[in-house]
Amino acid sequence: MPAPYEKGSEKKGANLFKTRCLQCHTVEEGGPHKVGPNLHGVVGRTSGQAQGFSYTDANKKKGVEWSEQNLSDYLENPKKYIPGTKMAFGGLKKAKDRNDLISYLVKATK
């Protein structure tokens, strides 16, 4: 079972985003979709629902409302959390890294 989410370092999370996520995602409002969807407003949004992005049926059918905790669960192993997702990222195994990244995303995607 994944570790419970705890607020992390937004600064470290920003660096993780730049090195692990930026090649496929944007965070700013109105930002373009890339290989992955724009993440603006991700917390509170239902999986597979970013306007204009072509999701797999698996993402659409998962029907999870993204929270800090289930983002942490997902980011530990995306293909295990949503079998059939096209997200190629293998995951962040360290809870601290997930906490830092999610703390950054919460702020950067509002």
UniProtKB/Swiss-Prot annotation:
One GO cellular component term, please give it.
mitochondrial intermembrane space
Provide the record's note on post-translational modification.
Binds 1 heme c group covalently per subunit.
Question: Sorted alphabetically, which InterPro entries does this protein's record hold?
Answer: Cyt_c-like_dom, Cyt_c-like_dom_sf, Cyt_c_1A/1B
- Principal location class: mitochondrion
GO function term, MF aspect, one: electron transfer activity
Q: Which Pfam families match?
A: Cytochrom_C
Q: Which residues carry this modification: N6,N6,N6-trimethyllysine?
A: K79
UniProt-annotated location(s) = Mitochondrion intermembrane space
- Please tell me where heme c binds in this chain: C21, C24, H25, M87
Recorded hits in PROSITE patterns, A to Z, give: CYTC (PS51007)
Keyword Mitochondrion attached? yes
Q: Which UniProt keywords apply?
A: Electron transport, Heme, Iron, Metal-binding, Methylation, Mitochondrion, Respiratory chain, Transport
Q: Does the keyword Electron transport apply?
A: yes
Gene3D superfamilies hit by this protein: Cytochrome c-like domain
Could you tell me what this protein does? Electron carrier protein. The oxidized form of the cytochrome c heme group can accept an electron from the heme group of the cytochrome c1 subunit of cytochrome reductase. Cytochrome c then transfers this electron to the cytochrome oxidase complex, the final protein carrier in the mitochondrial electron-transport chain.
Instruction: Report the sequence similarity comment from the record.
Output: Belongs to the cytochrome c family.
Q: List the protein's name.
A: Cytochrome c
**Gene that encodes it:** CYC1
